[in-house]
């Protein structure tokens, strides 16, 4: 354990209360949250809250003070970020104009533009320059808990919608102060921020694991020496991110599922003085692969810029100048009789560009574009020099890269000719609409839907079953061309693809695509639930993702969800989406006329009371099933049978471990008390040995104080002692009554399910062709009852790798992916 820095450290590199500078208040954040964290309706702003706190921990890492970060999505959809950095300063800021004078930690959490990032003695480079990050998170959270471990003490403060709670005013030297509460001693250090997003601000407060994992992966690659752990308590999923290699390792990771053209990754690193006499650090890596797509990721002080900026401009200028010069000197273009453009150089390029800039300037608080003009020159200089040397020293790699660029120029020229030909035929601008298209009457694209269906037979049913006012049907016969393996000119020679392009009306290609001409704002892929249908759906998604990504990004693409079951019970006939819905409906039938007699001569339980028992039982079992991937299911079942857990003290934790072990009663399971390395809180460690393999799971204080544990404990209180001697479950009345003796509630549930199956007929659908037009409308096309899945890309790198794996040339990665993910 490293020494804990004191609040009264020496002036050099001091990070104490005096480092915190206040610039203005927080008032506008809740009124206009979009100005600070982005859109509050589509999830970007919600996840930006996490990134703001995470960036603070990464800044501690950049300053050399943090090596461990733990991000946890709790079962109640709250988020905690814990690090082992220096901890936010906790001393009283005596130059605070506020009365009473507050601790530096409170100021950081409640004042806009307050932080240590404006003083270069505290942080040389930082992503959190604006100083609005963590205070914005506080303002936009219905509740936030701050724990600071610093100077041997553990401090705690709680906020509600940015307002400090339980504040204590003290008098020191005749001055009123409001110190942060000390809750104990500790030998640890660091900051923990645990917040609950405010439903009054955000339309949805459900955090997506993949979005967080994408950002954490980026940070891990860009910051050697920091270990980041991401845990999702809702599903039990957990990953550790500790990548090495910087931008070179990042490029290698992105290209791992692709066929690279040259084994040696180009990397340029260096530092240059800017016009403002500040040091700018540049790290860029590039490698070409055999695909036709450019993938360039830009970062400034670890913050991603999806819109690029001056650093990307410098990179492209250097590439164009150096590569053009090399191609001219070696007559590559002259021999091929083509002219090279910048787009040709970037076809198949994977590039990660990272710069470290003191006081960077961004276009907005979301930092999507770097606008610091002084960055372009250093990037261009570092890349130009290193790329010139790379091409000269590795002639084989240079020849391969230039060959790829020349081939891209040839293909661009061929695509131009093909585009002109198809434009003359009216395909690119939608004039040559297919005769198979059954168009709708509505002319407003925002109200129109296009169903892309598999084959003429399904198309016929869909055409008859649709509402022709706003629903158009386009049947596609056979397999769509796999665009992952095809060049642009080959795509334009495919009848199915040109038909789809003409129908959508947007054209295709980087220069021609125009989303404003989209004729249907809902594009619904409707294929069978069999293997062929899944393949066609994947081919269509590949086409849309690779060639028309804006359709996906703007939420225009959907997948139809036809029902899996048709169930008939007496005169009642209904369609059910999946196995879960079918199980719920069957239990509803089972409870009709059912009664539970818990003991001999006991009072029967029926109606709403029995339904409530079933609901509690099913809810508790669903939690056990969901959490069993993270926590041993025998331990969870023990909680449901009545074991009470308490981890507040060492003695209570040891008693809980003993009780849990006794209830599980399995010699292959060992329950012991442990503690979390960062928070020093007690944990229960459950080790199960099965056929020589050891599986370890953990129960922590967050789980014990969380809603899932509460549901299991409530179920335990309900069912413990409910079923006694002579208990029976029955259904019906009079001569038609049937009953069975039971030993526990689980047995009663099984008997009721079996009874429900007796008078029900079920049909399981395999494809759309099994439905007539009326059924297709009722189940899949009627907007009032249908279910649609919106296609969204949360992790672009992961999506890119999945498309490459599934649709690329390599068989082994595809086989491994299918084996891992097959049901």
Located regions from the model:
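Conserved phosphate-chemistry cores used by DNA topoisomerases
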Residues: 2-823
């Amino acid at each position: 354990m490293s020494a804990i820095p004191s609040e009264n450290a020496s002036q050099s590199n001091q990070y104490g209360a005096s480092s915190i500078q206040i610039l203005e208040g927080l008032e506008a954040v809740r009124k206009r949250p979009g100005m600070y964290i982005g859109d509050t309706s589509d999830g970007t702003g919600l996840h930006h809250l996490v990134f703001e706190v995470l960036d603070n921990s990464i800044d501690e890492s950049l300053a050399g003070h943090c090596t461990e970060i733990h991000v946890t999505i709790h079962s109640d959809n709250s988020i905690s970020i814990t690090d082992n950095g220096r901890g936010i300063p906790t001393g009283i800021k005596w130059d605070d104009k506020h009365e009473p004078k507050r601790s530096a930690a409170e100021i950081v959490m409640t004042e806009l533009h307050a932080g240590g990032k404006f003083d270069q003695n505290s942080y040389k480079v930082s992503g959190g320059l604006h100083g609005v990050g963590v205070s914005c998170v506080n303002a936009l959270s219905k509740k936030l808990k701050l724990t600071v471990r610093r100077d041997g003490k553990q401090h705690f403060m709680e906020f509600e919608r940015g307002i400090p709670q339980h504040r204590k005013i003290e008098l020191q030297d005749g001055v009123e102060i409001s110190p942060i509460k000390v809750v104990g001693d500790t030998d640890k250090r660091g900051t923990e921020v645990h917040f609950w997003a405010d439903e009054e601000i955000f339309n949805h407060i459900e955090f997506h694991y993949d979005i967080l994992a994408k950002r954490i992966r980026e940070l891990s690659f860009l910051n050697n020496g920091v270990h980041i752990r991401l845990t999702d308590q809702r599903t039990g999923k957990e990953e550790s991110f500790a990548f090495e290699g910087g931008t070179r390792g990042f490029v290698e990771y992105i290209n791992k599922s692709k066929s690279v053209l040259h084994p040696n990754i180009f990397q340029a690193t260096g530092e240059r003085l800017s016009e403002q006499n500040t040091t700018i650090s540049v790290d860029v890596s590039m490698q070409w692969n055999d695909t036709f797509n450019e993938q360039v990721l830009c970062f400034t002080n670890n913050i991603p810029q999806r819109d690029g900026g001056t650093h990307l401009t410098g990179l492209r200028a250097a590439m164009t100048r150096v590569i053009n010069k090399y191609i001219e000197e070696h007559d590559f273009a002259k021999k091929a009789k083509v002219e090279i453009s910048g787009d040709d150089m970037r076809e198949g390029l994977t590039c990660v560009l990272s710069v470290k800039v003191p006081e960077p300037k961004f276009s907005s608080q979301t930092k999507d574009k770097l606008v610091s003009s002084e960055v372009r020159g250093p990037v261009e200089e570092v890349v130009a020099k290193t790329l010139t040397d790379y091409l000269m020293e590795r002639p084989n790699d240079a020849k391969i890269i230039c060959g790829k660029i020349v081939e891209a120029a040839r293909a661009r020229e061929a695509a131009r000719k093909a585009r002109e030909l198809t434009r003359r035929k009216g395909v690119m601008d939608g004039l040559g609409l297919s005769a198979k298209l059954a168009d709708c009457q509505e002319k407003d694209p925002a109200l129109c839907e296009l169903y892309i269906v598999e084959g003429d037979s399904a198309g016929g049913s869909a055409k008859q079953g649709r509402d022709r006012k706003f629903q158009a049907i386009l049947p596609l016969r056979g397999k769509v061309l796999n665009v992952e393996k095809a060049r642009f000119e080959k795509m334009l020679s495919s009848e199915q693809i040109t038909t789809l392009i003409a129908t959508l009306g947007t054209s295709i290609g980087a220069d021609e695509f125009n989303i404003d001409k989209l004729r249907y704002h809902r594009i619904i892929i409707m294929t069978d639930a069999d293997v062929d249908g899944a393949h066609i759906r994947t081919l269509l998604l590949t086409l849309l993702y690779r060639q028309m990504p804006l359709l996906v990004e703007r939420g225009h693409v959907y997948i139809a969800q036809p029902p899996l079951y048709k169930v008939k019970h007496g005169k009642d006939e209904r369609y059910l989406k999946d196995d879960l819905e079918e199980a719920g409906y069957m239990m509803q039938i089972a409870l009709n006329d059912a009664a539970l007699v818990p003991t001999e001569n006991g009072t029967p339980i029926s109606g709403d009371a029995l339904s409530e028992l079933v609901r509690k039982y099913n809810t508790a079992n669903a939690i056990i099933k969901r959490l069993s991937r993270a926590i041993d299911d025998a331990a969870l079942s023990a909680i449901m049978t009545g074991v009470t857990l308490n981890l507040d003290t060492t003695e209570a934790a040891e008693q809980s471990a003993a009780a849990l072990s006794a209830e599980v009663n399995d010699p292959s399971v060992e329950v012991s008390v442990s503690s979390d390395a960062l928070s020093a809180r007690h944990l229960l460690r459950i080790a199960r040995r099965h056929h020589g393999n050891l599986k370890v799971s953990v129960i922590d204080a967050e789980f014990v104080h969380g809603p899932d544990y509460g549901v299991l404990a409530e179920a335990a209180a309900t069912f413990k002692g409910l079923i006694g001697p002579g208990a029976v479950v029955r259904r019906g009345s009079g001569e038609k009554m049937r009953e069975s003796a039971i030993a526990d509630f689980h047995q009663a549930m099984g008997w009721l399910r079996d009874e429900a199956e007796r008078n029900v007929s079920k049909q399981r659908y395999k494809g759309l062709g099994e439905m007539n037009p009326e059924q297709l409308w009722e189940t899949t096309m009627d907007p009032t009852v249908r279910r649609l899945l919106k296609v969204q890309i949360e992790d672009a790198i992961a999506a890119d790798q999945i498309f490459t794996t599934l649709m690329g040339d390599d068989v082994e990665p595809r086989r491994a992916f299918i084996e891992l993910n097959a049901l």
